[in-house]
Amino acid sequence: MDMMHLLVGCCGFPVSKSKYFQTFKTVELQDTFYRIPSIDSAKRLKNQVPQEFIINMKAWQVISHPSTSPTWKKAGIKIDKSKAKNYGYLKPTKENFEAWDKVLEIAHIYNPRVIVIQTPPSFGYNELNLKNAQEFFQTISYNNF
């Protein structure tokens, strides 16, 4: 019989990293939802974690949340206003695909097992959202995440 392997971690680091690493083997980064970290910042974090430690991450909110979302304002995201409707809700747009490429760039450093795509409450079920999500996920590269 196969044994299930369960990993338990937190969303972010609620205590110092050195203390966290003594207890947990994985973390889910929430910061990546608000802003994509710089390459240098991502490499610094990756170099701080134990070799077998798993860094999972949330995808950048511009892919899943519309530009009118309060979380965009909180994150201070600036975009060309004429393209605002092209972001969020997993729309299969150039802007969302470019944002996903930025997520992948950081994911190549962290090597997560999971990239969480958090959708807002306003992303309800309807035919358009389903069509957009299907096309988005059929188009993007996963790179084994």
Where are these regions (language model features)?
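Residues lining hydrophobic/aromatic ligand-binding pockets adjacent to catalytic sites
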Residues: M1-F145
